[in-house]
A protein has these predicted regions:
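C-terminus-biased signal that marks the final domain/tail of proteins
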Residues: 1-188
Length: 188
């Protein structure tokens, strides 16, 4: 859902999909206005709620949360329990969560860095987000997200088997995810 919606750079009216490869260097300069696509410079979050079936414990519900500009952030699973990971919790230093602040900083420095007046601040540098070399920000973060999901999957499966979320195990998972995200250079 995140890839197909929150990070979609397809426009059916214009009949373009930036991911097709037809809009990368050397075919184009790689600059496009964000207003033609779902993710916008002003987008601050995207969530997907993974609920439970009737009769299942509601605490097994997960809110997959992308804080900041979705193309420059990663989805973090959050459970309806005490204690959220620090990376998604508000910090006065950033006036946001560290993950949101890092995502927005990356977007400002690498995606929306063309500011010559007259609305140019809405131009996104597509080549930095997604390129034919596979080194774009979104391409690298998709791999990080997949690795995070592989870390989360055993915990999810164990929680479903038990019918509940163990808070100590959840705290350990959050710590591991936060360490992993830091190791990827997404956080200080």
């Amino acid at each position: 859902i995140f890839t197909d919606l929150a990070r979609s750079f397809r426009n059916n009216i214009l009949d373009i999909d930036l991911r097709s490869g037809n809009f990368n260097y050397p075919k184009t300069a790689g600059w496009f206005t964000d207003q033609d696509f779902i993710p916008r410079k002003d987008t601050s979050c995207s969530i997907v709620v993974q609920g439970v079936k009737k009769g299942e414990n509601p605490e097994l519900s997960i809110i997959w949360t992308v804080l900041g500009y979705p193309p420059t952030s990663v989805a973090v699973p959050l459970w309806v329990k005490n204690n959220l990971p620090a990376m998604v919790s508000y910090e006065k230093e950033y006036d946001a969560s560290p993950l949101s602040a890092a995502s927005l900083k990356l977007a400002k420095e690498k995606v929306f860095h063309y500011n010559q007046g007259g609305g140019t601040s809405h131009y996104l540098h597509w080549e930095n987000l997604y390129n034919l070399k596979g080194t774009g920000i979104m391409q690298r973060l998709m791999k990080v997200e997949e690795d995070m999901y592989q870390q989360v999957l055993p915990f999810m499966e164990a929680s479903y088997r038990k019918g509940k979320v163990d808070q100590k195990e959840l705290d350990m998972l959050y710590k591991g995810l936060e360490d992993f995200v830091k190791a990827q250079g997404l956080l200080k």
